[in-house]
Regions:
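Short glycine-rich, Thr/Ser-proximal phosphate-binding strand/loop in the N-terminal lobe
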Residues: 11-49, 143-169
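Short beta-strand-loop/turn "lid" adjacent to the catalytic site in phosphate-handling enzymes
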Residues: 63-92
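A short, structured active-site edge motif that brings together acidic residues
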Residues: 100-111
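Short, well-ordered amphipathic alpha-helical segments that serve as non-catalytic structural scaffolds
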Residues: 53-64
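Glycine-rich phosphate-binding/hydrolytic loop that grips phosphoryl groups
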Residues: 111-119
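Glycine-rich phosphate-binding "P-loop"
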Residues: 45-52, 97-99
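Gly/Thr-rich phosphate-binding beta-strand-loop-beta motif of the actin/hexokinase/Hsp70
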Residues: 1-25, 118-153
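Phosphate/adenylate-binding "loop-and-lid" substructures adjacent to NTP/NAD/dNTP-binding pockets
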Residues: 89-102
Protein backbone atom coordinates (compact mmCIF):
# COMPACT_ATOMS: atom_id res chain seq x y z
CA UNK A 1 0.00 0.00 0.00
CA UNK A 2 1.28 3.49 -0.79
CA UNK A 3 0.99 6.22 1.85
CA UNK A 4 1.76 9.91 1.63
CA UNK A 5 1.96 12.80 4.07
CA UNK A 6 1.74 16.44 3.05
CA UNK A 7 3.20 18.65 5.79
CA UNK A 8 2.30 22.34 6.11
CA UNK A 9 5.06 24.15 8.00
CA UNK A 10 5.86 27.82 8.53
CA UNK A 11 8.20 28.13 5.58
CA UNK A 12 7.31 25.29 3.22
CA UNK A 13 4.94 22.57 2.22
CA UNK A 14 6.51 19.15 1.85
CA UNK A 15 5.41 15.72 0.80
CA UNK A 16 6.74 12.24 1.30
CA UNK A 17 5.35 9.06 -0.25
CA UNK A 18 6.24 5.52 0.77
CA UNK A 19 5.41 1.97 -0.19
CA UNK A 20 4.51 0.25 3.07
CA UNK A 21 4.50 -3.49 3.69
CA UNK A 22 4.15 -5.46 6.91
CA UNK A 23 7.92 -5.32 7.42
CA UNK A 24 9.14 -2.07 5.91
CA UNK A 25 8.45 1.34 4.48
CA UNK A 26 10.37 2.39 1.39
CA UNK A 27 10.35 6.08 0.53
CA UNK A 28 9.52 6.42 -3.16
CA UNK A 29 9.16 10.19 -3.51
CA UNK A 30 9.93 13.42 -1.65
CA UNK A 31 9.16 17.01 -2.58
CA UNK A 32 9.23 20.42 -0.95
CA UNK A 33 8.02 23.81 -2.09
CA UNK A 34 8.69 27.16 -0.47
CA UNK A 35 5.63 28.80 1.07
CA UNK A 36 6.16 31.13 4.02
CA UNK A 37 2.70 31.36 5.54
CA UNK A 38 3.86 33.88 8.12
CA UNK A 39 4.22 36.42 5.29
CA UNK A 40 0.45 36.12 4.78
CA UNK A 41 -0.60 36.89 8.34
CA UNK A 42 -2.90 39.79 9.06
CA UNK A 43 -2.46 40.16 12.78
CA UNK A 44 -2.65 36.55 13.95
CA UNK A 45 -4.95 35.33 11.15
CA UNK A 46 -3.99 33.87 7.80
CA UNK A 47 -5.18 36.25 5.07
CA UNK A 48 -7.49 35.26 2.21
CA UNK A 49 -4.47 35.44 -0.13
CA UNK A 50 -2.52 33.20 2.26
CA UNK A 51 -5.35 30.67 2.28
CA UNK A 52 -5.43 30.75 -1.54
CA UNK A 53 -1.65 30.19 -1.71
CA UNK A 54 -1.93 27.32 0.76
CA UNK A 55 -4.79 25.67 -1.14
CA UNK A 56 -2.84 26.02 -4.40
CA UNK A 57 0.28 24.42 -2.87
CA UNK A 58 -1.71 21.55 -1.33
CA UNK A 59 -3.42 20.89 -4.67
CA UNK A 60 -0.04 20.67 -6.43
CA UNK A 61 1.18 18.12 -3.87
CA UNK A 62 -2.12 16.23 -3.99
CA UNK A 63 -1.76 16.01 -7.78
CA UNK A 64 1.65 14.42 -7.34
CA UNK A 65 0.11 11.90 -4.94
CA UNK A 66 -2.51 11.00 -7.54
CA UNK A 67 0.23 10.56 -10.18
CA UNK A 68 2.12 8.25 -7.82
CA UNK A 69 -0.96 6.13 -7.14
CA UNK A 70 -1.06 6.93 -3.42
CA UNK A 71 -3.70 4.91 -1.54
CA UNK A 72 -3.83 6.88 1.71
CA UNK A 73 -2.99 10.58 2.03
CA UNK A 74 -2.67 12.60 5.21
CA UNK A 75 -2.47 16.39 5.40
CA UNK A 76 -0.79 17.62 8.58
CA UNK A 77 0.04 21.06 9.96
CA UNK A 78 2.17 22.20 12.85
CA UNK A 79 2.94 25.54 14.53
CA UNK A 80 2.25 27.69 11.47
CA UNK A 81 -1.45 26.87 11.67
CA UNK A 82 -1.57 26.20 15.43
CA UNK A 83 -0.86 29.92 15.89
CA UNK A 84 -3.46 31.11 13.36
CA UNK A 85 -6.49 32.57 15.14
CA UNK A 86 -8.63 31.68 12.12
CA UNK A 87 -7.48 28.05 11.99
CA UNK A 88 -11.04 26.71 11.84
CA UNK A 89 -11.71 28.87 8.76
CA UNK A 90 -8.44 27.70 7.16
CA UNK A 91 -9.32 24.07 7.98
CA UNK A 92 -12.80 24.47 6.42
CA UNK A 93 -11.39 26.11 3.26
CA UNK A 94 -8.79 23.38 2.84
CA UNK A 95 -11.38 20.63 3.25
CA UNK A 96 -13.83 22.28 0.85
CA UNK A 97 -11.29 23.17 -1.83
CA UNK A 98 -8.89 20.19 -1.65
CA UNK A 99 -11.06 17.44 -0.17
CA UNK A 100 -8.42 16.85 2.51
CA UNK A 101 -9.00 17.21 6.24
CA UNK A 102 -6.17 18.90 8.14
CA UNK A 103 -4.65 16.95 11.02
CA UNK A 104 -3.32 19.63 13.38
CA UNK A 105 -0.32 18.32 15.31
CA UNK A 106 0.06 19.82 18.80
CA UNK A 107 3.47 20.87 20.17
CA UNK A 108 4.20 17.83 22.36
CA UNK A 109 3.21 15.46 19.53
CA UNK A 110 5.42 17.40 17.11
CA UNK A 111 8.36 16.96 19.51
CA UNK A 112 7.60 13.23 19.79
CA UNK A 113 7.44 12.90 15.99
CA UNK A 114 10.87 14.57 15.80
CA UNK A 115 12.14 12.01 18.29
CA UNK A 116 10.68 9.04 16.39
CA UNK A 117 12.05 10.30 13.06
CA UNK A 118 15.58 10.85 14.40
CA UNK A 119 16.19 8.43 17.27
CA UNK A 120 18.31 6.01 15.25
CA UNK A 121 20.50 8.67 13.61
CA UNK A 122 22.55 9.46 16.68
CA UNK A 123 25.97 7.83 16.91
CA UNK A 124 26.46 9.31 20.37
CA UNK A 125 25.44 7.76 23.67
CA UNK A 126 23.82 11.04 24.77
CA UNK A 127 22.44 13.31 22.06
CA UNK A 128 19.83 16.02 21.83
CA UNK A 129 17.80 17.16 18.85
CA UNK A 130 16.95 20.81 18.34
CA UNK A 131 14.35 21.40 15.61
CA UNK A 132 14.21 25.14 14.93
CA UNK A 133 11.10 25.84 12.91
CA UNK A 134 9.52 29.05 11.74
CA UNK A 135 6.92 29.22 14.52
CA UNK A 136 8.13 26.69 17.11
CA UNK A 137 11.23 24.98 18.45
CA UNK A 138 11.26 21.33 19.56
CA UNK A 139 13.93 19.85 21.83
CA UNK A 140 14.32 16.09 22.35
CA UNK A 141 16.71 13.91 24.32
CA UNK A 142 17.43 11.19 21.75
CA UNK A 143 18.86 8.84 24.35
CA UNK A 144 15.57 8.48 26.25
CA UNK A 145 12.16 7.35 25.05
CA UNK A 146 10.38 9.55 27.58
CA UNK A 147 7.94 12.21 26.42
CA UNK A 148 8.75 14.27 29.52
CA UNK A 149 12.19 14.87 27.97
CA UNK A 150 10.67 16.29 24.77
CA UNK A 151 9.39 19.85 24.65
CA UNK A 152 7.91 22.24 22.14
CA UNK A 153 8.38 25.99 22.55
CA UNK A 154 5.91 28.39 20.97
CA UNK A 155 8.67 30.55 19.54
CA UNK A 156 10.42 30.03 16.22
CA UNK A 157 13.01 31.55 13.95
CA UNK A 158 10.58 34.14 12.58
CA UNK A 159 9.78 35.33 16.12
CA UNK A 160 13.48 35.47 16.99
CA UNK A 161 14.27 37.37 13.79
CA UNK A 162 11.54 39.91 14.51
CA UNK A 163 12.78 40.42 18.07
CA UNK A 164 16.55 40.49 17.56
CA UNK A 165 17.33 41.54 13.96
CA UNK A 166 17.04 45.26 13.35
CA UNK A 167 18.45 45.32 9.82
CA UNK A 168 20.40 43.15 7.41
CA UNK A 169 23.34 44.63 5.48
Amino acid sequence: MKYSVIDISSSSISMIAADVTANAAEIVYKDRASLTLLHYLEGKSLSARGIDKLVEAVMVMKGKCVSLGVDILYLIATASLRAAENFEQVRAELLERTGLPVNLIDGPTEAYCDYIANRFYSSYERAALLDIGGASIEVCDLSEDNRENMISLDVGIFDLHKKFVKEIH
